[in-house]
Amino acid sequence: MQKGTLIEFWLHGHRHLAVVDRPKDNKHWIVVDHLNQAHTINPRQITYTIGPGYTTAEIPAFQAAVATQLDPDSLEVAWEILVEEGRSVDPAAMSTLLFADTEPVNCYAAHCLLSEDKLYFKQKGDVYEPRSVSQVADLKHQATIAQQRQQEWETLLSRLQQALAQPGSVDWQASDRPRLEALERYATFKEEANPRDATQAQEVLAALQRPETPEAAFDLLVALGLWQPHENLFLRRSQIPVQFPPTVLAMATSRLDAPPADADRDRVDLTHLKVYTIDDISTLEIDDGLSWEVLPDGREQLWIHIADPTRWVSPGDELDLEARRRSTTLYLPTGMIPMFPPEIATGPMSLNQGQVCCALSFGVILTPAGAVDAYTIVPSRIRPTYRLTYEDVDEMLELGVQAEPEIAAIARWGMVRSQWRQSQGAIAIHMPEASIKVQDDEVTIQLLDNSLARQLVAEMMILAGEVAARYGQAHNLPLPFRNQPQPELPPETELLQLPPGPVRYSAIRRCMPRSEVSLSPARHASLGLDTYAQVTSPIRRYSDLLAHFQIKAHLRGETPPFSAEQLQEVLMSVSAAAQEAVWVERQTNRYWGLEFLRRHATDLWQGLVLRWLREHESLALVLLEELGLELAMRFDRPVALGEQLTLRVAYVDPRNDVIHLREVDTPTVTDLPKVEQLA
């Protein structure tokens, strides 16, 4: 190259013009820019040669002249001509087309236009080839989309800043949802989030100068007012729907406005019976009631009335399929997520006091020992007389209210029935149970005791389940029978060495196998029954609803709606959904239990050593007796099963499921590993 040649090269991502001064060695040249700054370059770095005869002082004027010619719109006109001709051009040819000459300024301007263009031309060697009409159309479309996305991104950031400054002041747009949902999924699934979601969420966090972590995403969603500080991540990780689809709500409304014809027109009128419904005060879905009467022959008959949602639901309709998808009503400390829309579940489906209700009634006569002597199952009409709480019934039984001999008779038969089941090998486990409620951000824990009222209701429900299973077995009816294999319990001598109460029950509980659902009747070990089927919660447990469909069809003399094969298929999907619901309930209760302890960090609790988790590591399961919470604790001293302790929370983090307990009289605070609650 000659001294004085004006060339273009790139430095730090920008064009630079410089004049060739001299060679530095065999491979490099020294060039000088308009600031008289020297640069050492390799000839391969030169991207355009303008020509000889220039000095560095002329560079600014040359650049100014070029700038006046840089009109990108002119390229479109040139492209239209060249694409029609199918001709490629170099900068000189483009200069001729655009400016009608090949002056250095215009040639360089043409070079700049062509090299910066990403739409109309594609470089191939030293020439530029016009793109096809379809290619240009596609690129324009892509550019429009990119511009729109950039605008949406900038608008989203603006709205995010506004929402952070004034929570609740922003009306989020549809275009915001993908980024916000990615942020939610990143906060929910953490390291397991989809990589695309993680990337989008991290871009938002980085733009707002926040840590690019799932925890920061959670905090941002709370700060934006989109999430609550105690957002239920377990529920969000599940497939459990929170809202009902419009079609399901529409059908519920339709059934309320125009009830369908009753398939059981010949319901038995049992409205003369006094019916007690017994539930917690917060219960809204009332699905069982109890009666007692003396027959003309002097025998006593118990009635267990179960709500009849099949009066309002048919197999395969929208309400049924949605209930099947949900599988169960979910009971969380913060409220319930029902299996059916609330307006119909707590309305005509429920056994509401004073109203004539449709039911499936189980009439049972027991032997003096408590075995089933005779039974009848009938679709019925009843009128619940009293809605009682467990506390109401306990008080009535304690005071011996003379005006309610029926409730006393039911309680008496409940005790007889319990003793009979014990004689049949039933295994009773009475562990303290915590009922955790959250109302207006206040967390309360109530310890549920095994009162007479709860025992009598449980016995009557078990009795109805035995009768339903007997009916199904007698008529070879496909039903979701529930069974439990016989456990291998520790030897009696070993159990007697353990302190009675929770410690001993905990040892027995650990040996109990899971109950199973099968189409074949089999023994249920812990209930002490040869056959059993759950039928007493059809509003809130789909497998119970299935049993109602089957039994009621058979009572009418019809073919059951589900064959054995169909029932098995439905039960498989329902069981998976029900297991997920149990997991969400357990984890949510665990979270709020830890949150309660966090808020009472200075309180002292009476603890009981239940059993060893890993004795060689001094890791045990302890029961906080006032709360019914079971937690892991590592000891730095020898302890015995059944030993009572005074405990305090040393550290708790509900969101990360970590709690450290310490003995008040022991100065050493032991760091505890994260251990899942064992229940």
Regions found by a protein language model. Name each.
Residues 2-6, 10-16, 25-27, 35-37, ...:
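Electropositive polyanion-binding surfaces
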Residues 108-113, 126-130:
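Major-groove recognition helix of helix-turn-helix-like DNA-binding domains
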Residues 136-161:
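Short, amphipathic alpha-helical interaction segments positioned at domain boundaries
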Residues 50-61:
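Compositionally biased alpha-helical segments
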Residues 124-140, 236:
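Accessory beta->alpha helical hairpin/"wing" motif in late/C-terminal subdomains of nucleic-acid enzymes
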Residues 168-272:
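Low-complexity, highly charged intrinsically disordered N-terminal segments
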Residues 115-127, 227:
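A short, conserved structural fragment
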